[in-house]
């Protein structure tokens, strides 16, 4: 599922959201296809790849196809964990990694697996009362109230602001939120409890999170406009 409340179930459908959303591009997918069809280069590629002129069908499929190539997997953490390059992480970063995956913090319970997400919907106690009701809007299930999709942490050092509403400007604020155990909320995940981290431990965690930055992926010229 895509989007923070999980309201979109395919990449092809997800393409429509930023394109047509009023607060983003505010454009019509049909009109977008028609405009691109006037550009000879795009029309040639469309005929070659999809055997049809550029239109809304091609726009959604082509963009989704490109998005499926955006796979990040060569960060310092990947080099250390998957490629057995012990020198890829510093002692500080290794301490942070061990803390991240420990039963003390439970970070890895939600942010595990290759993409550092369990793909579930959780309430992390960001607020005692949320303005946005999250997944509840779609399901009307009380157990889904104020729950949002657990995001991937890959390249998280570059994706501020954080939380579903962008209310935290840096990783220090995020770590402190989890350190105090979030706010009291009926649907808050039972995994989120006070961590009682000291200053050095917070710095270790943040150092580890920065090891998830894949500079090779970020600087890939083929992925730039």
Segments from the language model and where they lie:
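Periplasmic c-type cytochrome electron-transfer domains
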Residues: 1-225
